[in-house]
Structures are given as structure tokens and as C-alpha cells.
Amino acid sequence: MMNTFDVIVVGGGHAGCEAATAAARTGAKTLLLTHRISSIGEMSCNPAIGGLGKGHLVREIDALDGVMGRMADKAAIQYRMLNRSKGAAVQGLRAQIDRKLYRQAMQDELLHYENLTVEEGAVEGLIIDESGKKPRVTGVVTQAEISYAAKSVVLTAGTFLHGLMHVGEQKTIGGRVNDVSCEHLTGDLKRLNLRVGRLKTGTPARLDGKTIDYSELQEQKGEENPERFSFFADTPILPQVSCYITATNPKTHEIIRANMHRAPLFSGQIHGVGPRYCPSIEDKLVKFADRDSHHVFLEPEGLDDDTVYPNGISTSLPYDVQDAMIHSIKGLENVRIIRPGYAIEYDFVDPTEMKATLETKKADGLFLAGQLNGTTGYEEAGALGLLAGVNAALKALETDKEFTLDRADGYLGVMIDDLITKGVDEPYRMFTSRAEYRLLLRSDNADMRLTQKGVDAGCVGKKRAEAFAAKKAALDEARAFLNSVTRSPKELTQAGFSVNLSGERRTGMEVLGFANVTWDDIVKAFPNLAQTRADVAEQLCIEAKYQGYLKRQEADIAAFRKDEALKIPEDIDYKKIGGLSNEVVMRFERVRPATLGAASRISGITPAAVTAVLGYVKNMKK
């Protein structure tokens, strides 16, 4: 008898962990299949979570009751708020993570998760029912020829589809060092007529920290009283460690340039496109030829692990070149190299093949998440996995509901919209600059933006829903008080505030918005607020400082939502729309946007083309 589940998630990386737990939370009987349980939660590249844009995604995952933020807080050994000197909208929390502790925490979480079964099995194929109008994926088959049936399947294969690693001319099949590759799933994806491409990523060598000379290197400490990723952080902060900063130099660059012909990236050996914002050191020397130095951040991999990750010198150069290059860097003259850096090529699916739910347009019941969608990064993968898992569960449970987020809801909405309307020609990485409504999409208010949506979708548990409701009530009460209470200029002056003596009374919220006014100042003037929660006070301070800008951005969002409200029928025939060139028709047919707003964001689409679509759709509805 076939093993039957509501949802099957293939892969135990960051996307798979979030997809499996999200599907289980939403009420689906869920199976996570991974080739090795001991590798669940593995951090394959850098030992860090968060950063600019990425920290926002972790907070959004947490707001939807995902697991990454809580697991990161259990394993964080250094916290830093990036862009601390800038506005709240562009600040990003980043943490160095103890790899072993993170992996252990994630495995413990998943192996005891309600509604979730975890089994070992290398998935080699999809079970496809082609009897209907559209193919439907109804299960998977493992290498051991064990079949599993499900109403929804979520693929989170990471770099494992036809994974090929490069160190100089040496090639090794695998999705990660000392790991296997999945050789047959791509064939099933192509059988479903999904467009498959090739991308590349890379990682630096790993170093023995005991053999590094830190004496002349710049120390980079973490923050003493750090913020945490999770709104639910209730675990003690671990002992915190320092990173160190060194740099390449002209000798390093001379070694690399003398061996550039041996670099797989430039010899024609690698065909996949790498991430623009995380280039290899050999790529940096080509793109920034005028620079004679690049920073190298020495990041510890754990509290009881001497391994160090040299962030900034990712490479696939031959081992002898890596050896000479690394030993030319200050502090690393006598370092022992534990293992060399490498590049990895892998298959991905053109993300314009997906709906906003992350289900494929050409096959029912098949959802894709993570690097398989053309992204790079743990945080991007985790966020996509969560949304795919929720929608896979909603479909399997036949709820007739979908869980989607748009560009005004969160960074996850921005990322999905970018992927499904623009596609990718290089691995996609999240930045705050990608979000046009970033003043409203701050990391501090991720729960206020998203948790209720998660409650409505069914993916937020009772404990978090209750905590969110309590915080929202406290926030609404304090905000209402600040907006209702007023003080005259004379009263404010007597309280120590510097104000214009125009006679105009000011609300508490307006006073809080004054430059250099702190929450402590407000409490002195309005003692009723003395017992306000710290997280509520922080959010009100930010709202007050930004209130003029926020009102303008809310007006922009209203206009955006108007375009998003106009749905384009799935079966629309773009060839019948007058005035569209063959090229524009081809672009529309490739993406098949779900809304007028999405149509306007497709690369190469003119306002005139959008107007033509609008007129045609309106006529269809008459």
C-alpha cells in the first residue's frame, strides 16, 4: 500500500524546513523527505543569518510563526544591527550563527513537530497524472523505489539538481561538499514543460582558527544588548564572540591574476551565472580592476569549533592557487586550510513559471521554493518555503483559499512579485532597495503587518496568535491615547520641550515626532504611558518620527492596490488584443501576469500595452 500524505516536502534545507513546518501548522498531514536527516538545517555556506533586507525576511518568517528566527536566536553567537546610524526602514539585524547548534535546534524542532513526519529518502522522480486537462503531480518516488502519494508536493531541492562542484579543473558531482546530487528530477520538470536553466554559486575555503594570527587584525565585536530575530525570543543569549577583519593586497591580486586562465569561471568550464552581489574573488578582480584591496571578514563557525569562514574570498581556483592566495593575506600567513573553496552549478526553474502561491502554472499540485526558484540565501529560501508550504496545505485540504502577499504587504511579497513577473538571469538576493514601500515594511512591525494574515490563513499557532493580539491591543491603546491627548505650547515648554509658541495645541503623537524627543521624555509629559511595553514604545517612536512620510506612502499603496485589484483571466489570448507587438505578446504569454499591476512590472512592457490590456479585460467583463 502506498504511503499517503496531504503534503510532501522534498529537501531538508532552509526552504524545506519552513515549507514542512508551515504545511503542518496549517493542518496538513505532512511528510518531509530528505536524503539524510542529520543534514537538516545545514548552513552550507556562511555561518550567518540576516543582514540588509534579509533580516526583514527573517522577521517576516517569524511573524508568520515560522522557525528560522527562533532557531537563529538559539544559536546566535554575535548580533549586529547593520545600518544602525540610518533610519529604521533600512536597518537589518544580522547574527553569526553556531552551525552545529543551529542544525541541532532545527532537527529537534522538526522531529517533534505536530502533524509532521520526517523520513530519509533520496527522491528521484515525480508521480504525474496526465489524464486531465493539465498534468497533476500526485506524489514522489525515491531511489529505493518507494512511492509516496500526496495532494501537494513542494520541491525544495536547493543546489542538488544536477549539482556539479568545481575546484580548478577538478569537477565533482554533488549538491554540496561530501554530499550527493539529484540526477533525475530535472527530467520530470522538463517533462512538465517547465523552463529549466543553470545557475552558479560558490563558497570560500575553511580555515583553522587556531593557526590565524589575530594580533594585528581589526576586531569586530557584536552588540552588548542586542535585538533578537524572533518576536518570541525567550531563550538566553549565548556567549558572544568577535569577528576579525583583514584584507587582500597587491600580492594576493598578483597571484590570482597570474592564474586567471585556470579559473573555471573564465576558462569556459562553468556555464551557470553567479550571484552579482556575492562575487568570487576572481570575479571581483575583473569587475573592480582598479582596486588593490578587498575586505575579508573572518567569521567563527561555532563556540566549540575552531573553523573560520573567510567571508569575501569565495573562489573556485585550483587548490595550489587558493593556498598561495590565502597565505598572502595578513594574519593568514601560517593558516591551515581545512578545505578549499569551490563553485557549484545547479539547475533551477524559471520563476515566471509560478503563480503568486508558488504553485507551477503548468502542473497542479507542484510547488517550488528556495534556490530552485532562482534565489540565493538562507533567508530568501526560508521565506519562499513558508509561503509554498502554507499554499500546498491549503490546496491539499481543499479549502479554496490561497495565501498570497503583495509588494505592500512585505519583503516576501516584493520577492515573489519580482520573481514571477521579471524572472531571473542571475541568483536573486533581497535588498531593502527592492521595496518601494520600505518605510511601512520595517522589521520592527513585521508582526503587525503579517501575523493576522497568517492567523486568517491558518499557519499561526494559538500561542503566537494570543501574544500578537495582546501586543496589538497594547499598541492600539497607547497610540489612541497619544493621538487623543493634547498639550498647549506653554505646558510643553514647562515640561522641557522646545516648541513654537504659536498657541497651537499638539497631540502626544506629534510631540513624540519632534526631533530628539525620546520615549522617556514623553513619559515625563504623559505619565499614563509609564507602563508601556518596550516593543510597543519602540514602534510608536518610529511611527511618530515617520508619520508624514507614512501618510504619503499609504496614498501610494492605495493607488498600487487599485491596479492589483484588476484581475487578468488566466486563459486570456494576448494575440487578440489590438495594438500589441509580437514581442509584447511573447512577454505577456511567458509570464501570464495575474493582475494589471503585475503586467505593468514585466520588463519591456510599455504603459500603452498595459492600457490595451486594461481595455480588453474590461470589454471581456461586459
Where on the chain are the PLM-derived regions?
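Beta1/beta-strand and adjacent pyrophosphate-binding region of the FAD-binding site
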Residues: 3-15
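Core beta-strand elements of the Rossmann-like FAD/NAD(P) dinucleotide-binding domain
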Residues: 3-5, 143-152
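Short hydrophobic core segments
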Residues: 10, 147-158
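Conserved N-terminal/central alpha/beta ligand/cofactor-binding core
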Residues: 21-127, 156-176, 180, 184-186, ...
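An anion/pyrophosphate-binding glycine-rich loop and adjacent beta-alpha core
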Residues: 36, 186-323, 421-505, 509-515
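Conserved beta-strand-loop-beta-strand element in the redox core of flavoprotein oxidoreductases
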Residues: 127-146
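A glycine-rich dinucleotide-binding beta-alpha-beta segment and adjacent secondary-structure elements
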Residues: 309-375, 403-417, 533-587, 592
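Extended, charge-enriched "interface" segments that sit outside catalytic cores
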Residues: 434, 440, 451-605, 609, ...
